[in-house]
Amino acid sequence: MKRQCKGSDVSKAVLVVAVLFFTVLRSNGQQIKPADSGYVPVDGNKVYYEVYGDGKPIILLHGAFFTIGMNWGQLIPELSKQRKVIAIELQGHGHTPYSDRKLTFPSLAADVEKVMDYLKIDSADVAGFSMGGSVAYQLTIQSPKRVRKLVIISSTYKSGGWRPEVTNAFKGFKPEFFTNFPFKAAYDAVAPDKTKWTKYLEQMIAFAGTPFDLGDANIAKITSPVLIISGDNDGLDKIELAKTYQLLGGGLSADLGPMPKSHLAIVPSQGHVSLMMQTKTLAGYLEDFLK
C-alpha cells in the first residue's frame, strides 16, 4: 500500500528546503562590491541590477526567493575576472520592488531585455538558476538573437521537469514557513518597502505552484549553444532532462559524428541548493563552455 502524503510531510519538505536556503545565505554572501548598480524602469515598476568586471557580458538570473548575493555571491568574483557580469534581481526579489503585476515567464524575460536595452547590451551569454533558468529559457525563446550562449543550472522549462515530490512541495509552501528563517532578515535588509513581505511571499508561492510549460517545440528551435548543469539528486526528473538535452541536439554518439554544440553536465552528490555552492566546479564548466 502506498503511503499517503500528509500535509505535515509537505511541511517538513519545505522546512528542509528553507534550512538549505539558510546554509546558502550564510555561505554565499557577496564577496565584492559592484562597479555599478541601479534601477531600470519596467511597466510602472523598476528592476534592480548590479555590474561587475569588464569583458564580454554575461547576465545572471537568480532562483525563486533568492537575491543576487545569496545565489551568485561566490561565483561573481570568479566570473568577473574576465567578464562583464550583469546580475539582475527579478520582480519582488531583493532590491526590486514588489509589484501587483501578474508574474509570468514572458514578463520576467521582457524585464531582462529592458535591462539589456538600458545598459546598451545587444546580446550576451545568459546563466540562470532554478526559476532564473526558466526565465533564461523564455528569454532565448522570445528573443533568440539576444542570447549568445545559455547556461541552465538545476532548472527546467516545464513543471513536469521536476520530480513529483518537488512539485508537491511547491504546492505546500506557506508564508509562515519563511518568516522564522533568514529570508525575512534578508528581505528587510534591502527591500524598498518592507511592508510588502507577505504579499511578495503570497505572489511567489502562487507562481511557484502554478503548472507551466514553455513548449517542447520552442526548446527544439533554440539555436544558441546550451549548457545544462544538474545535480544528480537536485529534484529534476532525469528522464525528462535527457529528453530536454535531445531536443537541444544532444544525447548522440559523438564517435559517429560531430560533438553537439550543447552540453550536459551531471554533478555527483549534489542537491538543488548545494549545487550552487560548488563554486570551483561551476566556474570551471562556465569557463570552458563560454570561451
Identify the residue ranges that each predicted region occupies.
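Active-site nucleophile elbow and catalytic-triad environment of alpha/beta-hydrolase enzymes
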Residues: 203-218
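Short beta-strand/loop motif that positions the catalytic acidic residue
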Residues: 222, 228-230
